[in-house]
Amino acid sequence: MAGAPSSEKLWGGRFTGGQDPLMTAYNESIYYDRAFYSQDIRGSIAWARANKNKGILNDHEFAEIERGLKEVEEEWKSGKFSIKPGVDEDIHTANERRLGEIIGKNIAGKLHTGRSRNEQVAVDMRMWLREQLDNIESFLVDFLKVIASRSEQEIEHVMPGYTHLQRAQPIRWSHWMLSYGLAFANDLERLREVKQRVNRSPLGCGALAGNPFGIDRDAMANELGFDTLIYNSMAGVADRDFVVETMQWGSMLMLHLSRWAEDLIIYSSAEFNFV
């Protein structure tokens, strides 16, 4: 049964009783979004710096928040961070709870001034996804270089070209490889287009209607590596198209990889013995 309301939660102050454990477990996302710990901390440091520049935080308060957040990040990196079940419902509350334990709640409590978790989670997701796409882009570029190099080195190799697994015409081995090279090059081009829409900053959008303190959104976006801003605050916090678009792009990439792998599996069989 639910007990008394938790004094450690960020919300529920008007509740007369504690939250049902089933609801607590259902509502927690910390075991998924803890993957965003670094992005969340970097976003919080950028936010605190912008608040300091507006005079909302003084130099000492900002220095303490930055120091504390970097200590929290080291705990995550070293595997020493301890999640509090029932309290740390997501990565944002976990990081801020631990920050308060390190530097004291009086200063830590000022970190979130003017910021909504709506924009915070959107920033974390976009930064994390951008970094994953950067990694995939690097792998794809290396892969394409190998395809191009092997195609040039092995240009004189000839093989049967197949339709429905029936021999049709003689082709160069490099022609087969470059058919996939073109598909992966198109995937690379599409990835870069997707990344342009991912890499837009919603920080400063507030819960839905912007920031009341005139915080410098451009400075925060530059610090966090965003290309531009999302200028409509409601769109900034509500949009998840960039996630769906990335998944759509990933589906096409995996389709091409599957076709390529299937050909290689067939060509490496005893019946074909090309590979």
What are these regions (language model features)?
Residues A2-G210, I215-N222:
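A helix-coil-helix interface module used to build multimeric assemblies
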Residues L224-V275:
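Acidic, glycine-rich loop-and-beta core segments that form the ion-binding/anion-interacting portion
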